[in-house]
Curated annotation (Swiss-Prot):
The gene is trpC. InterPro entries: Aldolase_TIM (IPR013785), Indole-3-glycerol_P_synth (IPR045186), Indole-3-glycerol_P_synth_dom (IPR013798), Indole-3-GlycerolPSynthase_CS (IPR001468), RibuloseP-bd_barrel (IPR011060). It catalyses: 1-(2-carboxyphenylamino)-1-deoxy-D-ribulose 5-phosphate + H(+) = (1S,2R)-1-C-(indol-3-yl)glycerol 3-phosphate + CO2 + H2O. It comes from the Bacteria. It is an enzyme of class 4 (lyase). This is Indole-3-glycerol phosphate synthase. Its EC number is 4.1.1.48. It holds the Pfam family IGPS. GO terms for biological process: L-tryptophan biosynthetic process. Pathway: Amino-acid biosynthesis; L-tryptophan biosynthesis; L-tryptophan from chorismate: step 4/5.
Length: 262
C-alpha cells in the first residue's frame, strides 16, 4: 500500500474513533433505520442503459490529493441539479474532508437538489461509516478491495444491504476482482488509476473485462475524459461510467456530461 493511501486510512481510523465518541453507533443506527427514502442506485444505472444510454455516475468533488483543487466555484446543489438535468443516472459525492475537501453536508445538499440516487464516496473501513452513510441519505456505498480484508468486505456489504443500500465494489487488478466477485453486489467498479503509482490507463478495464461473468455490471472509473473514451468502452459493452475530474473542471458540469456521452 502506498504512502498516500496508508495515510488516508490512518486518518479514517481516527475519524471513526472521534465520531463514535460524539455519537454512539446504536444511536446512529436508529437514525439510519428510521429513514425510508432509499433511491435505487443500481436500478437507476440499469434504467439508463435499457434506454440505450450510458449509465453515468456523475461525481461531485472539490479537490483530490493528486490534482489539488479541481473547482473553486463549488456548489454541490447547483452541480447536482445540472447533472440531473443533463442525463446522469446517479451521483457520487465525496465526503472525505482532509484529502478531497468533501463533507457530509455536501452529500445532503446534492441529494436534496435532485431525485437521483447518491453514492457516498469515501474510504470505508468500519461499520460506523456504513451506518453514517445511510443516516446522511446515501443510497449506495463504495467498498475498495485494496483497503479491506475479504471478511471485512463481506460484513460491510451485508450491513449496507441490510440498511437498504446498494454497494459499488472497486478493484484495480485480477486478484482484487476475485475478491469482488465473491460478494453479492452486481456493481463492479474498475478503477483505471493505479492506487500505488496514480498512473491512469483505460487498458485496466479492458484487461479485466473477460474475467467478469454475466450478471455483473461493470462501472469504469477514472481516466474517462473525452467522448472517444466513452465510445471505446461502449464498443466493449462497458455501459456504466463514474466520471469526476472531467466534469469538475468544466464551466457547467452537466453540459460537459451531455457532451461526453453524446
Amino acid at each position: 500500500m502506498n504512502d498516500i493511501l496508508a495515510k488516508i486510512l490512518a486518518v479514517k481510523a481516527e475519524e471513526v474513533a472521534t465520531a463514535r465518541q460524539m455519537r454512539s453507533e446504536a444511536e446512529l443506527l436508529r437514525e439510519a433505520q428510521a429513514r425510508q427514502d432509499v433511491r435505487g442506485f443500481a436500478q437507476a444505472i440499469e434504467d439508463k442503459i435499457s434506454q440505450g444510454k450510458a449509465g453515468v455516475i456523475a461525481e461531485i468533488k472539490k479537490a483530490s490529493p493528486s490534482k489539488g483543487v479541481l473547482r473553486e466555484n463549488f456548489d454541490p446543489a447547483e452541480i447536482a441539479a445540472s447533472y440531473a438535468m443533463h442525463g446522469a443516472a446517479c451521483l457520487s459525492v465525496l465526503t472525505d474532508v482532509q484529502f478531497f475537501q468533501g463533507s457530509h453536508d455536501n452529500l445532503r445538499r446534492a441529494r436534496a437538489a435532485c431525485s437521483l440516487p447518491v453514492l457516498r464516496k469515501d474510504f470505508i473501513i468500519d461499520p460506523y461509516q456504513i451506518i453514517s452513510a445511510r443516516a446522511m441519505g446515501a443510497d449506495c456505498v463504495l467498498l475498495i478491495v485494496a483497503t479491506l480484508a475479504p471478511a471485512q468486505l463481506r460484513d460491510l456489504e451485508t450491513l449496507a444491504i441490510d440498511l437498504g443500500m446498494d454497494v459499488l465494489v472497486e478493484v484495480h487488478d485480477a486478484k482484487e476482482l476475485d475478491a469482488a466477485l465473491a460478494l453479492r453486489t452486481p456493481l463492479i467498479g474498475i478503477n483505471n488509476r493505479n492506487l500505488r503509482t496514480f498512473e491512469t490507463t483505460l487498458q485496466t478495464t479492458l484487461d479485466l473485462l473477460p474475467m467478469i461473468p454475466a450478471g455483473k455490471r461493470v462501472v469504469t472509473e477514472s481516466g474517462i475524459l473525452k467522448p472517444e473514451d466513452v465510445r471505446l468502452m461502449r464498443e466493449h459493452d462497458v455501459q456504466a461510467f463514474l466520471v469526476g475530474e472531467a466534469f469538475m473542471r468544466a464551466n457547467d458540469p452537466g453540459v460537459e456530461l451531455a457532451r461526453l456521452v453524446a
